Amino acid sequence: MSSSKHSSVFNYSALFLSLFLQQMDQNSLHHLDSPKIENEYEPDSLYDMLDKLPPLDSLLDMEDLKPNAGLHFQFHYNSFEDFFENIEVDNTIPSDIHLLTQEPYFSSDSSSSSPLAIQNDGLISNVKVEKVTVKKKRNLKKKRQDKLEMSEIKQFFDRPIMKAAKELNVGLTVLKKRCRELGIYRWPHRKLKSLNSLIKNLKNVGMEEEVKNLEEHRFLIEQEPDAELSDGTKKLRQACFKANYKRRKSLGDDYY
């Protein structure tokens, strides 16, 4: 029952809408067209209007253009352009104003210097001092090399050459060079060490005569470092070496 009622209402509404549209005048609806804006001035007319404008200098009141304290004007001009051409500007800089340049400025009445300048001077002076120090050291080494004599060098024959150079306060190369100049081509440390060991061993066995001969031979090597060991000294050294070897071996056998 309710569905038939709704359908009848829809039919009446559709009929009413169709009758309303038939009675409307189609010509009564206005077209919504946007109006076209037309420019009333042509481009050429704009240029003509600019030509008709009065000169610019006639629009300005020259009485209002008054100079300030830093400018000096000459008011003898015939047109607006002459006004600006005849302006004289005072570019004088006061003496109490100091311009900044690439180099630091130091005032004459200032009692203190720039920290940067002091630092730079300190670095330069340090470099100079280092150069002078190195040069002095080289000169001292050269003088030290020239002053080395045989009497001073032979006191260090009983120790290695590197240790001797350190105690003599010279370089190893300097000491070797000076030794060659004095005729010392081989450092006699090993020879003297061998002789001292041999003398000690012979003293322990009571061979006083051989000890005396070895001491004389040691003195000879201290005077002539390139002198060779005698055949008798070499034989004694070999005999002592064999005796020490047998003694150590026997001690080792007793231990095991």
Swiss-Prot record:
Coiled coil region boundaries: 190-224
GO molecular function: DNA binding; DNA-binding transcription factor activity
Protein task: Putative transcription factor.
Assigned keywords, A-Z: Coiled coil, DNA-binding, Nucleus, Transcription, Transcription regulation
Entries under PANTHER family matching the protein: PROTEIN RKD4 (PTHR46373:SF27)
One GO biological process term: embryo development ending in seed dormancy
Signal peptide: none
Protein name as it appears in the record: Protein RKD4
InterPro entries: RKD-like (IPR044607), RWP-RK_dom (IPR003035)
Top-rank lineage group of the source organism: Eukaryota
Domain RWP-RK stretches: 130-216
Pfam families, alphabetized: RWP-RK
Cell compartment(s), UniProt: Nucleus
GO cellular component, one term: nucleus
